[in-house]
Amino acid sequence: MSDSPVTLPESIKLTEYSHGAGCGCKISPKVLSTILASQLPVFTDPNLLVGNQSRDDAAVYKLNDEIGIISTTDFFMPIVDDPFTFGRIAATNAISDIYAMGGTPIMAIAILGWPINKLPAEIAQQVVDGGRQACMEAGIMLAGGHSIDAPEPIFGLAVTGQIALSDLKQNDTAKKGDRLYLTKPIGIGILTTAQKQKKLHDEDSLIAVNAMCQLNTIGATIAKISGVNALTDVTGFGLAGHLLEMCQGANLTAKLKFDAVPLLPRALDYLALGCVPGGTHRNYDSYGEHLPELSEHQKAILCDPQTSGGLLVAVSAAAEAELIALLDANHITPICIGSLETPTTQANVVLC
C-alpha cells in the first residue's frame, strides 16, 4: 500500500474542524487528577501489575509467571490537514505506548468519531487507511473498531500487546545516578502550531510529520537492557511533564541539561514567530510549581506538547555504553540530557 497523502479539495482542511490538535488535546494533568479521583471502594487484582497509579503509558496484566498482556488506548483530533497522514500519526502514537512499556503490539482496534454532516465519509476512509498503514508497519492487524457521529473528527486506536515480564519497564522505577536519554527531538507542538497559524513554510511541512510517523519500535529492544531502569514516552504533557512523572514516582530530582535537549529543525525559528500551542500554557499551569524558575523560552520548549514523541530512557551508568551502542546501530543520535539524583530542593527538575 502506498503511504502517499490523498489530495483534499482546497476548501477542506481537517485542522479547521477541531479546537485542539494531536496530543495537545489532552486534558491538563491538574484537571485529570480531579477526574480520576474516585469515591468508590478500591478494587484490587493481584495480576494487574501496572494500573493508573503512576500515570504510566499502558496497563499490564500478568497472564503467568513469564508473560503479561499490555493494554492501551489513545485518540485525538487532527494535527495535520491530510486525512491519511492524520490516521497514520494517530495510530503510530497509540501503538508506541506498547513499546514504551518494553513490549510488542499484537493487534489493534480503531476508535473513530466523525462529523458526518460536515465531512464526507470518503475522507474518514482515508483516515482509517492511514491507521492501517501504521499497523502494517508495526506488523499487526487493525482487527476492528467502533465509530460514532461526533461534532469533531477524532481517531485513534486501542492496542493490545505482550511482554516478557522480565523486560517490563515502567515510568516510576528509575534509580539514583541514572542517565537520561531522549530518542526523538522536541518541537512537534511548535511546528504543528505554525501550520495551524498558517506560518509554516512549504519546505518545512514534513519535519514534524516524519517525526510523528516514526514508530518507537526501539523501545522493545531498549527494554532488554537490564540497566535500563525506567522508560516512558514523551507526549501531550511535554518533556517536563513526563520527566516529572518519572521523578515523582521514584522520589528523585532530575538535573536537566537544557542546552542538550534535542530540537527539531526550524523549531526555534517558529518559536520566535510566536508559534506556542495552548497546551504549553496548560502544561505549565498544571505542574510549574515543581519546576525551577524558567524563562518563557525554556517553558515553550520543556512544556511543548508532543504528539507521537520519543522515548525518555533512564539508564544506569554501567549500562550507558550498551544503550548508546544500540541507539547508534538504529540511527538514533544518543544525547544525554541529564541525570537523576537524590532530591535537594522542592523542585523535581533543576536545570544545569
Swiss-Prot record:
Residues annotated for Mg(2+) binding in this entry: D57, D97, D233
Site feature Important for catalytic activity, where: K26
Catalytic activity: hydrogenselenide + ATP + H2O = selenophosphate + AMP + phosphate + 2 H(+)
Domain of life, per lineage: Bacteria
Keyword field: ATP-binding, Kinase, Magnesium, Metal-binding, Nucleotide-binding, Selenium, Transferase
GO MF: ATP binding; magnesium ion binding; selenide, water dikinase activity
Cofactor annotation: Mg(2+)
UniProt EC number: 2.7.9.3
GO CC aspect terms: cytoplasm
UniProt xrefs under InterPro entries: PurM-like_C_dom, PurM-like_C_sf, PurM-like_N, PurM-like_N_sf, SelD_I, SPS/SelD
One Pfam family, short name: AIRS_C
Active site (record annotation): C23
Cofactor binding note: Binds 1 Mg(2+) ion per monomer.
Gene Ontology biological process terms in this record: selenocysteine biosynthetic process
Sites where the protein binds ATP: K26, S54, R55, D56, D74, D97, G145, H146, S147
Oligomeric form and interacting partners: Homodimer.
Protein family (similarity comment): Belongs to the selenophosphate synthase 1 family. Class I subfamily.
Known role: Synthesizes selenophosphate from selenide and ATP.
Database matches in PANTHER family: INACTIVE SELENIDE, WATER DIKINASE-LIKE PROTEIN-RELATED, SELENIDE, WATER DIKINASE
Protein name: Selenide, water dikinase
Gene: selD
